[in-house]
Amino acid sequence: MKSILNDFLLMIQFFTRIPINKNLQCEKVNFRRGAFFLPVVAFIIGGMEFLIYLGLKNFLPANVIIVLLILFTAMVTGGLHMDGLADTCDGFFSLRDKERIIEIMKDSRIGSYGTIALIIDLLLKYQLLYSLVLKGYSIAIVLAPIIGRISILFLCLSKRTAKKNGSGNIFIGNMSKPIVFFITTIILALSTYFLGLRATIIPFIGALLITYLLYLLCLNKINGLTGDTLGACNELGEITFLLILLMM
């Protein structure tokens, strides 16, 4: 029980700005087991967003609430995944060789491609969530971040790391397939309860497809994955899920 709590808190501490202030075991096995809780952390974040939406929907227009929810997410996560998307785009669109791309991705400064990617990412999230709320799919506020994290877990089933060292290496190739498939089954079952089978499976397949395409792009550009590409995967998975759900 103590190890389970350790791994759960480790995921919160690693992926959010929520102050845990505890000395936790941070071995590779803890991250491997803790992967089960990554969608749970996303559920907590999405759940808090949904409660904010419910609390404000009678006082503010839906479009204003969505902006506040995106701001809230950025504050809670520290913009971790959005930063990964920006760094990935800066590197990949630089059209340089592998070593230079990785060097660009490690640069803390954001470039023009990263800026464009962030603007498009935020605009799409805003418009898609706003449109889905108006369509009666407010539960997408909760589901989208969960699907994004599930996409990360599937990407991490690969063992191809682009760097010898990096924060992403504690996840890449360090996933248990039974854990990934088990938590995915639970999430899909819950999503089916709220959205129905068709509106769950098709957007989810779309998210997995974009994850696989990103994986192929990573192999082509840097011969593997990094922590930044995992963040990019989360953002692309969320956007794809929301986009296809809106089309249903």
From Swiss-Prot:
The keyword Nucleotide-binding does not apply. It catalyses: alpha-ribazole + adenosylcob(III)inamide-GDP = adenosylcob(III)alamin + GMP + H(+); alpha-ribazole 5'-phosphate + adenosylcob(III)inamide-GDP = adenosylcob(III)alamin 5'-phosphate + GMP + H(+). It comes from the Bacteria. It is a multi-pass membrane protein. InterPro entries: CobS. The chain crosses the membrane at residues 36-56, 59-79, 114-134, 137-157, 170-190, 199-219. Its cofactor is Mg(2+). One of its GO terms (biological process) is cobalamin biosynthetic process. Its main location: membrane. Keywords: Cell membrane, Cobalamin biosynthesis, Magnesium, Membrane, Transferase, Transmembrane, Transmembrane helix. Pathway: Cofactor biosynthesis; adenosylcobalamin biosynthesis; adenosylcobalamin from cob(II)yrinate a,c-diamide: step 7/7. Its EC number is 2.7.8.26. It holds the Pfam family CobS. It is found in: Cell membrane. GO terms for cellular component: plasma membrane. GO terms for molecular function: adenosylcobinamide-GDP ribazoletransferase activity; cobalamin 5'-phosphate synthase activity. Joins adenosylcobinamide-GDP and alpha-ribazole to generate adenosylcobalamin (Ado-cobalamin). Also synthesizes adenosylcobalamin 5'-phosphate from adenosylcobinamide-GDP and alpha-ribazole 5'-phosphate. Belongs to the CobS family. This is Adenosylcobinamide-GDP ribazoletransferase. It comes from Clostridium botulinum (strain Kyoto / Type A2).
